[in-house]
């Protein structure tokens, strides 16, 4: 396998949270319901959502940042052991198939008010 693309992105947690407050419908345009909630059904914190948004931005960059990708066609989920993963459908899956992406690697972090993510597309 070889690396097809790499993307990295950062998001300021406070600014991202303010955007979600200012525009309540934004969360539904960016995230699936499964991404907004913790396994117990509680709402996920802003830092965690900012990291997930950074992952979606990084994923778009790894795919060459084409127009027309839908944010909700990329889902950031976490394995039982805590490892973040990506699940792609629709517009994102189509672009990934076009490029020959067979697997994804994603790393999320948030500290000192900044959320970050790195995505590697491998094929």
From Swiss-Prot:
Its EC number is 2.7.8.7. GO terms for biological process: fatty acid biosynthetic process. This is Holo-[acyl-carrier-protein] synthase. InterPro entries: 4-PPantetheinyl_Trfase_dom, 4-PPantetheinyl_Trfase_dom_sf, ACPS, Ppantetheine-prot_Trfase_dom. The keyword Transferase applies. The keyword Magnesium applies. It is found in: Cytoplasm. It comes from the Bacteria. SUPFAM superfamilies: 4'-phosphopantetheinyl transferase. Keywords: Cytoplasm, Fatty acid biosynthesis, Fatty acid metabolism, Lipid biosynthesis, Lipid metabolism, Magnesium, Metal-binding, Transferase. Gene3D superfamilies: 4'-phosphopantetheinyl transferase domain. It catalyses: apo-[ACP] + CoA = holo-[ACP] + adenosine 3',5'-bisphosphate + H(+). It is an enzyme of class 2 (transferase). Belongs to the P-Pant transferase superfamily. AcpS family. Transmembrane segments: none annotated. GO terms for molecular function: holo-[acyl-carrier-protein] synthase activity; magnesium ion binding. Mg(2+) binds at residues 9, 57. Transfers the 4'-phosphopantetheine moiety from coenzyme A to a Ser of acyl-carrier-protein. Its cofactor is Mg(2+). GO terms for cellular component: cytoplasm.
